[in-house]
């Protein structure tokens, strides 16, 4: 049995919703979007925010003095009623002659400021609808304005600078997380990972499990007969699939692991003590399960920070996932 849940609002969705509601109410609004980032820039490619004429803001382009400067600039342009489509380069180095951001972190980023008008309402509405329905598409920003295309691009990001510049981004959820087991640690991990724009699915076989009922952070709850069913529910995904096995015991962990071991994931973690994980891996080796499969498993899952509570365990696993995601 599968249920979709949407009580928890995602950061990007909230930002686009502010853009849409501003236009629907006739409130002037500006979109700030990071088209390109280099080096140690705090605002990475794809970061964005919306500022409207009533003082509302959602999203971020990296924070700090640079973001403050741009939000103040946006408010001034809104007060003046400017129709703006302006690309600005920001260099985070006080030694450069121009385009200084006021920061000293040595990176740089390129930001577009775009006034949102009636012409953009349909486009933004489509973006909101696609995120709400968990579909992907292509956001295109260019010297001609903004549009949304239903075709999903091959690349997550693309930017062509110049006078007739073009920026394209795959919208929707790029990263998917599969949590196997729905206990206290899974609840804490779901809460944390939902803030990081992962599409989260959780699997358990225990009907009426209190921690599953309280878990309003996942997008999808899947009740299964037993963990042998996972083979038809979770597929390989070496680029964007992140899996953590954290069931209620050794037997159910083993059942899930046997189904998932042949698959490739960007991250594959197994929660448990060192002794339990070692015993499980030794057993698989004795059975002749390929060492290549076993090397892909991170067990015990999470960075070694002597975590004890579900919340601390969730932090350790989330940190390891972020580490893997960014290739550290």
Residue ranges and their predicted role:
Residues 183-184, 250-251, 275:
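Residue-level detector of alpha-helix initiation sites
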Residues 59, 63, 245-249, 269, ...:
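Glycine- and other small-residue-rich loops at beta-strand/loop junctions that grip anionic moieties
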Residues 2-205, 209-220, 238-241, 255, ...:
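Segments forming oxygen-rich coordination pockets for charged ligands
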Residues 271-328:
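Adenosine-phosphate binding glycine-rich loop
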Residues 227-238:
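Short amphipathic alpha-helix with an adjacent loop that forms part of the alpha/beta core around
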Residues 202, 221-222, 264-271, 290-297:
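Short hydrophobic/aromatic-enriched beta-strand-loop microsegments
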């Amino acid at each position: 049995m599968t249920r979709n849940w949407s009580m928890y609002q995602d950061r990007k969705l909230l930002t686009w919703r502010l853009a849409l509601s501003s236009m629907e109410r006739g409130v002037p609004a500006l979109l700030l979007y990071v088209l390109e980032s280099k080096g140690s820039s705090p605002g990475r490619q794809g970061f964005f925010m919306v500022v409207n004429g009533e003082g509302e803001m959602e999203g971020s382009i990296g924070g700090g003095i640079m973001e403050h400067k741009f939000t103040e600039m946006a408010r001034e342009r809104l007060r003046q009623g400017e129709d703006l489509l302006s690309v600005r380069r920001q260099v985070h180095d006080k030694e450069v002659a121009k385009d200084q951001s006021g920061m000293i972190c040595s990176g740089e980023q390129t930001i577009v400021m775009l006034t949102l008008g009636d012409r953009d309402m349909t486009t933004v509405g489509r973006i909101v609808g696609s995120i709400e329905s968990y579909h992907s598409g292509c956001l295109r920003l260019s010297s001609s304005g903004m549009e949304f295309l239903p075709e999903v691009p091959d690349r997550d990001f693309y930017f062509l600078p110049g006078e007739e510049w073009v920026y394209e981004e795959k919208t929707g959820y790029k990263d998917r997380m599969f949590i196997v087991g729905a206990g206290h640690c899974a609840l804490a991990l779901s809460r944390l990972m939902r803030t990081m724009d992962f599409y989260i699915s959780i699997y358990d076989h225990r009907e009426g499990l209190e921690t599953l009922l309280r878990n309003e952070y996942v997008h999808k709850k899947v009740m299964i007969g037993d963990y042998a069913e996972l083979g038809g529910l979770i597929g390989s995904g070496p680029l964007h699939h992140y899996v953590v096995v954290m069931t209620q015991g050794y037997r159910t962990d083993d059942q899930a692991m046997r189904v998932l071991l042949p698959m490739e994931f960007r991250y594959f973690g197994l929660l448990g003590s060192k002794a339990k994980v070692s015993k499980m891996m030794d057993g698989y080796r004795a059975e002749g399960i390929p060492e290549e499969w076993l090397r892909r498993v991170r067990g015990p899952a999470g960075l070694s920070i002597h975590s004890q509570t579900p919340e601390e365990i969730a932090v350790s696993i989330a940190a390891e996932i972020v580490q893997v995601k960014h290739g550290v």
